[in-house]
């Protein structure tokens, strides 16, 4: 009887929680993406004005519920001196969203180096990665094929994991919902990193 009640309680009052890192260089649009995610998935969330978002120093945390899953986002600062902190969070995470500023061709190689260092970490083996080519609302941005070509020599280092490169505009919200829903499917089916249980009451 206890097992039945325990199972019923879990079904009704607990969600599977997955930690997802939002990484990328500074000014790529990580925090704007996080704010748009919270606005789109949390009914009563009144987001901060996107014009007031500044460079993240440290960590922003946000939560989004999608069906029976709860995503706990950790938006980490992307400045060079803060990138050394990224790997402290790898062991706990279930997925990575890597944001690229597709309007900043000058820093594309720097972004690629940061991506390559991240994706080759053993602590992230098997963890799904969503690569967002952000700022696609800007006419002069690099296209998805341009981004894929620039990152092509990273392909062999991605290994056996779910990985998707997707167009996005965090400012307008285009591609935000699709990216989150893709990530939810991936983390839920990844048996190598089981979720944490959290009460939702």
UniProtKB/Swiss-Prot annotation:
Signal peptide: none annotated. The modification N-acetylmethionine is found at residue 1. GO terms for cellular component: Golgi apparatus. Pfam families: Arf. GTP binds at residues 24-31, 75-79, 134-137. It is found in: Golgi apparatus; Golgi apparatus, trans-Golgi network. InterPro entries: P-loop_NTPase, Small_GTP-bd, Small_GTPase_ARF, Small_GTPase_ARF/SAR. Disulfide bonds: none annotated. GO terms for molecular function: GTP binding; GTPase activity. GO terms for biological process: Golgi to plasma membrane protein transport; intracellular protein transport; protein localization to Golgi apparatus. Keywords: Acetylation, Golgi apparatus, GTP-binding, Nucleotide-binding. Trans-Golgi-associated GTPase that regulates protein sorting. Controls the targeting of ARL1 and its effector to the trans-Golgi. Required for the lipidation of chylomicrons in the intestine and required for VLDL lipidation in the liver. Interacts with SYS1. Belongs to the small GTPase superfamily. Arf family. This is ADP-ribosylation factor-related protein 1.
């Amino acid at each position: 009887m206890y097992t039945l009640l325990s199972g019923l309680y879990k079904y009704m009052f607990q969600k599977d929680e997955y930690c997802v890192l939002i990484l990328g260089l500074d000014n790529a649009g990580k925090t704007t993406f996080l704010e748009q995610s919270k606005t789109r998935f949390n009914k009563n969330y009144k987001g901060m004005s996107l014009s007031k978002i500044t460079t993240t120093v440290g960590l922003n945390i946000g939560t989004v519920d999608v069906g029976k899953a709860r995503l706990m986002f950790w938006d980490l600062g992307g400045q060079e001196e803060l990138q050394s902190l990224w790997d402290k969070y790898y062991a706990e995470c279930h997925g990575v969203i890597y944001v690229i500023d597709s309007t900043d061709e000058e820093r594309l190689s720097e972004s690629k180096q940061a991506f390559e260092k991240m994706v080759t970490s053993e602590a992230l083996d098997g963890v799904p990665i969503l690569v967002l080519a952000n700022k696609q609302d800007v006419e002069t941005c690099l296209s998805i094929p341009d981004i894929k070509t620039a990152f092509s020599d990273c392909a062999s280092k991605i290994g056996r994991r779910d990985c998707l490169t997707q167009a996005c505009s965090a400012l307008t919200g285009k591609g935000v919902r699709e990216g989150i829903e893709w990530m939810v499917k991936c983390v839920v089916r990844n048996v190598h990193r089981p979720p944490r249980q959290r009460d939702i009451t």
